[in-house]
């Protein structure tokens, strides 16, 4: 008999929940609401909201809008987006995650205080990611984005450095970057670093590893665009090599291998609970005779 368990700690983080609730609330009062970028990196959840009247646009689309309501998702936006909205008489529904908002303010304050002494502001994050674009915008585009240790060659270790992190990055990865910078800094040169990783995200790492290792087989459910999903999946697979990444229920087409009894279903901070529940139902259907 197959036993299927959904990880109670997986699913939307509070920032994503707030953004989706904001969209649903607005769509309850209007037929059309625009969202700048995918509200969440999960295509099925985006489709659900689009059926309610949500229209996803990019920055070019925003520049053409006038006199409309636009939702800013949890990832946050640079100051230039707010300036454009004001010029175009766009009403902003700001669903920026409070953790991201605090980080934006912290980086902006650091930039204002250190720009005169030529300090390098460095962000450990994914280049081009919406959150990172918003953070870089707080420095008038001057921040240096570091994705991996090898990128540190771009820094000048004879000049002061202030290091921040994208909120959804790996804590271990951040610690490794800090250690490497410390080792390379010229003697007497100032290096300040700030652990700005969201603990709701960071705490999922040990939890999801424990969850994965306690099952014979794991389905990790996430959107292909989710950075958090990719990171958590890799950790899941390290803990349990029998971990499969899926984005939709339709990807489960075969019964489980013989001998599998305990199956886990987990996901990213952008994975809706309803999708994990559908995956669990599908697993039971395909393995009903096992």
Curated annotation (Swiss-Prot):
Pathway: Isoprenoid biosynthesis; dimethylallyl diphosphate biosynthesis; dimethylallyl diphosphate from (2E)-4-hydroxy-3-methylbutenyl diphosphate: step 1/1; Isoprenoid biosynthesis; isopentenyl diphosphate biosynthesis via DXP pathway; isopentenyl diphosphate from 1-deoxy-D-xylulose 5-phosphate: step 6/6. Signal peptide: none annotated. (2E)-4-hydroxy-3-methylbut-2-enyl diphosphate binds at residues 41, 75, 129, 167, 226-228, 270. The keyword Oxidoreductase applies. Dimethylallyl diphosphate binds at residues 41, 75, 129, 226-228, 270. Its EC number is 1.17.7.4. Binds 1 [4Fe-4S] cluster per subunit. Disulfide bonds: none annotated. It is an enzyme of class 1 (oxidoreductase). The active site is at 131 (proton donor). It catalyses: isopentenyl diphosphate + 2 oxidized [2Fe-2S]-[ferredoxin] + H2O = (2E)-4-hydroxy-3-methylbut-2-enyl diphosphate + 2 reduced [2Fe-2S]-[ferredoxin] + 2 H(+); dimethylallyl diphosphate + 2 oxidized [2Fe-2S]-[ferredoxin] + H2O = (2E)-4-hydroxy-3-methylbut-2-enyl diphosphate + 2 reduced [2Fe-2S]-[ferredoxin] + 2 H(+). Catalyzes the conversion of 1-hydroxy-2-methyl-2-(E)-butenyl 4-diphosphate (HMBPP) into a mixture of isopentenyl diphosphate (IPP) and dimethylallyl diphosphate (DMAPP). Acts in the terminal step of the DOXP/MEP pathway for isoprenoid precursor biosynthesis. This is 4-hydroxy-3-methylbut-2-enyl diphosphate reductase. It comes from Parabacteroides distasonis (strain ATCC 8503 / DSM 20701 / CIP 104284 / JCM 5825 / NCTC 11152). The gene is ispH.
